[in-house]
């Protein structure tokens, strides 16, 4: 009975706290929505420019006119770009070139990458039977894409790799990320959105590199992409891992 009275007495205050929390979060949500809208607008404009460059100088005016005519229909806009640049590969090229340009114009729009240590030096030394006489060893183990991947979302790319040194000390490495669009038995490399290449200084052990790849709103269901992750250290040739994924409904 006492607990019930206490809950009844606290109810108005809890309601006030909850309302205050929502009000406090509201500006952050609005700011994020505003940033997303600005990024989307930038990408659309850059897509028009990229498409026009491929189709000829006079295409800018024509595409702009079509976009104005269909300004309320994003699906039609996407179809116009896709038709102008030539199918799935052309659309992907225009989109990722555009988004890379927009990231460079405003770096705050670019999703941050994350590097996380997943196994210690000693753990990995036992697992792979590493010997100090091997010197510096850097290997890309695997790439995973969190499913499902849908249009108008971000594909989470997790790349696992390890670096071993004779004494477990830190060493400099370079990671490289690549993105390809696959059509039939062919694939075409497109601009990787964000940091395609990044230098790191890491201690011996296993690491997981996480980045997010934006997927265009107008991407067709069934579109296939391949991501590639490379790691290089001590001037040696890079070690590579890759993963193919499909955009679903």
Model-derived segments and spans:
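Short, surface-exposed loop/turn segments at beta-strand-coil junctions that are enriched for proline
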Residues: 199-203, 212-221, 234
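Short, low-complexity, glycine-enriched hydrophobic/amphipathic alpha-helices that associate
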Residues: 39-109
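Short acidic/polar inter-strand loop motif in beta-rich domains
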Residues: 230-241
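Bacterial N-terminal signal peptides that target proteins for export
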Residues: 3-15
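N-terminal signal peptide c-region/cleavage motif recognized by signal peptidases
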Residues: 26-28
């Amino acid at each position: 009975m006492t607990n019930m009275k206490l809950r009844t007495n606290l109810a108005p205050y809890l309601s006030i706290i909850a309302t205050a929390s929502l009000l406090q979060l509201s500006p952050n949500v609005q700011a994020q929505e505003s940033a997303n809208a600005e990024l989307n607008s930038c990408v659309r404009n850059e897509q028009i420019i990229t498409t026009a460059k491929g189709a000829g100088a006079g295409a800018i005016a024509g595409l702009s006119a079509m976009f104005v005519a269909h300004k309320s229909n994003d699906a039609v806009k996407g179809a116009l770009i896709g038709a102008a640049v030539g199918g799935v590969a052309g659309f992907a090229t225009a989109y990722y070139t555009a988004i890379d340009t927009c990231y460079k114009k405003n770096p705050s729009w670019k999703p941050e990458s994350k590097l996380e240590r997943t196994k210690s030096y000693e753990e990995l030394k036992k697992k792979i039977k590493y010997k100090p006489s091997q010197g510096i060893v850097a290997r890309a183990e695997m790439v995973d894409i969190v499913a499902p991947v849908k249009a108008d979302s971000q594909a989470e790319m997790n790349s696992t790799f390890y670096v071993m040194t004779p004494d477990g000390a830190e060493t400099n490495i370079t990671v490289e990320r690549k993105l390809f669009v696959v059509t039939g038995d062919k694939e075409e490399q497109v601009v990787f959105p964000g940091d395609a290449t990044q230098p790191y200084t890491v201690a011996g052990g296993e690491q997981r590199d996480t980045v997010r790849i934006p997927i265009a709103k107008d991407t067709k269901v069934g579109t296939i992409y391949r991501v590639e992750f490379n790691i290089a250290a001590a001037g040696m040739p890079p070690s590579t891992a890759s993963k193919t994924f499909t955009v679903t409904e």
